[in-house]
Curated annotation (Swiss-Prot):
<keyword id="KW-0418">Kinase</keyword>
<dbReference type="Pfam" id="PF02223">
    <property type="entry name" value="Thymidylate_kin"/>
</dbReference>
<dbReference type="InterPro" id="IPR039430">
    <property type="entry name" value="Thymidylate_kin-like_dom"/>
</dbReference>
<dbReference type="InterPro" id="IPR018094">
    <property type="entry name" value="Thymidylate_kinase"/>
</dbReference>
<keyword id="KW-0547">Nucleotide-binding</keyword>
<dbReference type="GO" id="GO:0006235">
    <property type="term" value="P:dTTP biosynthetic process"/>
</dbReference>
<dbReference type="GO" id="GO:0006227">
    <property type="term" value="P:dUDP biosynthetic process"/>
</dbReference>
<dbReference type="GO" id="GO:0004798">
    <property type="term" value="F:dTMP kinase activity"/>
</dbReference>
<dbReference type="InterPro" id="IPR027417">
    <property type="entry name" value="P-loop_NTPase"/>
</dbReference>
<dbReference type="GO" id="GO:0005524">
    <property type="term" value="F:ATP binding"/>
</dbReference>
<dbReference type="GO" id="GO:0005829">
    <property type="term" value="C:cytosol"/>
</dbReference>
<keyword id="KW-0545">Nucleotide biosynthesis</keyword>
<dbReference type="GO" id="GO:0006233">
    <property type="term" value="P:dTDP biosynthetic process"/>
</dbReference>
<comment type="similarity">
    <text>Belongs to the thymidylate kinase family.</text>
</comment>
<comment type="function">
    <text>Phosphorylation of dTMP to form dTDP in both de novo and salvage pathways of dTTP synthesis.</text>
</comment>
<protein>
    <recommendedName>
        <fullName>Thymidylate kinase</fullName>
        <ecNumber>2.7.4.9</ecNumber>
    </recommendedName>
</protein>
<keyword id="KW-0067">ATP-binding</keyword>
Amino acid sequence: MYIALEGIDTAGKSTQIELLKNEYKNNILFIKEPGFTKFGTKIREIIFNDDISKKAELFLFLADRAETIEKFVKPNLHKNILTDRSVISGIAYAMEFFDFNMLVNLNKFATDGIFPEFVIILKLDKETLQYRLSQKNHDNIEKRGLDYLINIQDNMIEVCNRLEIPYLLLDASKNIEEINFRIKKVISEYMDID
């Protein structure tokens, strides 16, 4: 089973992934986008720190996704895979600038049509997002602002709906343990865990 954990910046994905790794490290392959491969680490550095065009950014994300899918997802589709970000957020971020159908086709090409089978979206309200962003330095994506990130969050839901990928929406302002409990419930329901 291939599940994606999605959410905008500061939603708590990384925190949840670390908690899940501690519990399921022997049962789930944990990956992330961008930057899971050596190649992807270089791409991540460029995307988040260099001043590049939106089109260049899109193709770098696609290159990272293609590499991760080819080297880690495809050979392990018979296993449990949990990814921190996926094609869902890739399309959600890019559809602010590019046509949805074109993005779907580019991502189908990059992934050989392998999309997550289920998505968990951590959703933040505007006030919580504003507070969390005020507590950190911003990368190039976060510098686009509060309204941009809230739109991306809505886009993630739209992408799941349009691609007909089942998803669960979780309130990311809840406490870490409650969110973790809900995610583990999904894992036990959808993944074959020994």
